Amino acid sequence: MNFETTVGLEVHIEMQTNSKAYSPSPVQYGAEQNTNTNVIDWGYPGVLPEINKGALEFGMRAALALHCDITQDVGFDRKNYFYPDNPKAYQITQARTPIGTNGWLEIELEDGTKKKIGIREMHVEEDAGKNTHNPDGYSYVDLNRQGTPLIEIVAEPDISSADEAYAYLTKLRQVIQFTGISDVKMEEGSMRADVNVSIAPIGSDKLGVRTEMKNLNSFEHVRKGIQYEVKRQERLLMSGGEVEQETRRFDEPSGETILMRSKEEANDYRYFPEPDLPPIHISDDWIEEVRASIPEMPDKRRERYTQDWGIPAYDAGVLTQTKEMSDFYDATVAAGAGPKLAANWLMGEVNAYLNSKQVELSDTALTPEHLATMIKLIEDETISSKIAKKVFKEIITNDTEPKAWVESKGMVQLSDPAKLQPIIDEVLDNNEQSIEDFKNGKDRAIGFLVGQIMKKTRGMANPKMVNKLLMASLKER
């Protein structure tokens, strides 16, 4: 029997607001434990939450970027459960009126196939705190994260493989990062995925019983977890067993999923309207104001790069992997660099430097203006590509103006025929045998002579001009 896979994804993304969703406590990753929290986060009796307008607008921005319809009359609900990192014993969410519905995201697989994945709904809610279990036998609760604004993005069950899930998460992270509402760093917990997996016989009109994997914190774990879970369920069904609805965790060392608990149903959480927060009406004008704040999305940028600037589709994809790189590229071209050469430098030397140092562009001294100036020096043949690499090392580590630095170091390329010709003549006079070799059709003689000229000029001669003058001189001899 053959089966088809159905994957459901619920993705939680922390929003980078200045303060929490319903309290004035600051949002700051990495702060000392329990320093960014207050009585609202602790759930003290008699304290009242207050809606963070910025969090609501960030949620609207994400919903619009994902082509969702905005719910114009939104309310808030309590999701009731007890856990040490949730001292209120409930989470404020949007069970009845999600901020966005009926959206979609287009993914592209490695073979170039494109597919639209539906977005069922998107909620604005709050994060829980963090439990730490120490070897001393005690568990500790850090409430800095408690109340941090989240968006929960619920995909339709349109994903049918581990690779599609991986592509969806990659594209979702890219789109959200471009909106500017989150840094979407899975390693820091600002993007987490819950995965539902089920299988059913091919052609069946009913979905199989699903299992859930919670809080997967890397795309590769999602892919491997789905692959293992599909095989596990296939083995169960083929041996006459049944798939149980349960929550499992992905164990990285073994590459397997391990049972955590039987799955709760929605009614286990006893949802009811949040009595301390009023419903909010989102006007058409407010929606359009938020829409206007959304920057150009990666798909549009790729289209512009390929159609307007002639950049290959693959290169355009690399340049739009992050908003930081794409913004830097746009600014470099705006500063006067040729689009193709700017793309080559960013994808080549710049990316190589960032990867080797494990840093981001913002951690370096490089500016679009300085990179553009260096590229223009290459384009007008003031410096060679070889010299440009030395210039690049200087401008990415120090706040140095490239043109002034090149001139101060005597690195300006020698292109003046009046200065090059005497050097060429001297090399030819000292290498009669190479002239004979050239006349006898031995092309390698040219390479030798060019090398001698470059040696005489300490590598500063313009290779194009050297070749032009050398060929003319050889024809005269």
Swiss-Prot record:
GO biological process: glutaminyl-tRNAGln biosynthesis via transamidation; translation
Family, as annotated: Belongs to the GatB/GatE family. GatB subfamily.
Protein name in the entry: Aspartyl/glutamyl-tRNA(Asn/Gln) amidotransferase subunit B
Gene from which this protein is expressed: gatB
PANTHER family for this protein: GLUTAMYL-TRNA GLN AMIDOTRANSFERASE SUBUNIT B MITOCHONDRIAL AND PROKARYOTIC PET112-RELATED, GLUTAMYL-TRNA(GLN) AMIDOTRANSFERASE SUBUNIT B, MITOCHONDRIAL
Enzyme Commission code: 6.3.5.-
Assembly with partners or alone: Heterotrimer of A, B and C subunits.
Lineage top rank: taxon: Bacteria
